[in-house]
Amino acid sequence: MSHISVLLHETVDALLANRDTGIYIDGTFGRGGHTRLLLSKLGSDAQVYGFDKDPQALAVAHQLEQEDLRFKIIHASFADIQTELEQRGITQVEGVMADLGVSSPQLDQAERGFSFMQDGPLDMRMDNSQGKTAAEWLLSIEEEALANIIYQYGEERYSRRIARAIKQAGALETTAQLAELVKTAHPKWEKHKHPATRTFQAIRIAINKELEDIEIFLPQAVTLLKPEGRLAVITFHSLEDRLIKQFIQKESTLPEDSGWGLPQKQVDSRRLKKISRIRASEEEVKANPRSRSAWLRVAERLV
């Protein structure tokens, strides 16, 4: 299945807010769907910078660099957004977006080791040039720590049973081995959901430090935004969405009033204004079932 960008027009339109110039950041370039639409709506003096760790995404991005001189790709995590941009002399931008989903090619290519639907090496690294593979990581982690991760990042109620089965099995080499092991250890299957879904999600999040990277990325993104600049983030599961929601809430809420009225300094401390929360339309879900769980949250920089 080729990659279809989720909430494509909604995200780009929210990010631009009727502008056609400025500097914009795509924190998760992927296969470039959002970036290409963004470039098509921007004038000749605009700039777009993409970030990605995935070697296959980088290959697509380098091709786009040749096609459009307004675009530059940066081989780094969006957690390094501020440092990487400052090194290039950029301290303020008009918009920052991130699509936190795993791309369809990553899921569909068995050799990437993300999918329980296809057999492949147990890898799961976004950047497969560095770090431990899922197989190596599972071998090295203690059972209790693994159970906690499966519970926390997969919201899996049978995490202890699954962790015990994984550790008792010893070295695992393929996604099919892990999926079968989880299936056997899982006593109660959810309707329309593979029993290994939550466990695979948890392991992927842990290996790639996905939630930690989001927590590092968000305050940096807001710091980079000019007043009236936009932040647009697409999430695919409740853990991600909760992080984005809580961050925007914190940055857009006034401190508690002591009863004497808030000093102007505290009123001015709010950095964001909530703009919208959008989910994929019925038409989009029908055309691309992977968009079913997607949410787009948009906020605007105040000061």
Curated annotation (Swiss-Prot):
Q: Which InterPro entries match?
A: RsmH, SAM-dep_MeTrfase_MraW_recog, SAM-dependent_MTases_sf
Q: What UniProt keywords are attached to this protein's entry?
A: Cytoplasm, Methyltransferase, rRNA processing, S-adenosyl-L-methionine, Transferase
Listed binding positions for S-adenosyl-L-methionine are: G32, G33, H34, D52, F78, D99, Q106
Q: Which family does it belong to?
A: Belongs to the methyltransferase superfamily. RsmH family.
Q: What PANTHER family does this protein's entry cite?
A: 12S RRNA N4-METHYLCYTIDINE METHYLTRANSFERASE, S-ADENOSYL-METHYLTRANSFERASE MRAW
Name listed for the protein in its UniProt record: Ribosomal RNA small subunit methyltransferase H
Q: Where in the cell is it found?
A: Cytoplasm
TM regions (residue ranges) = none
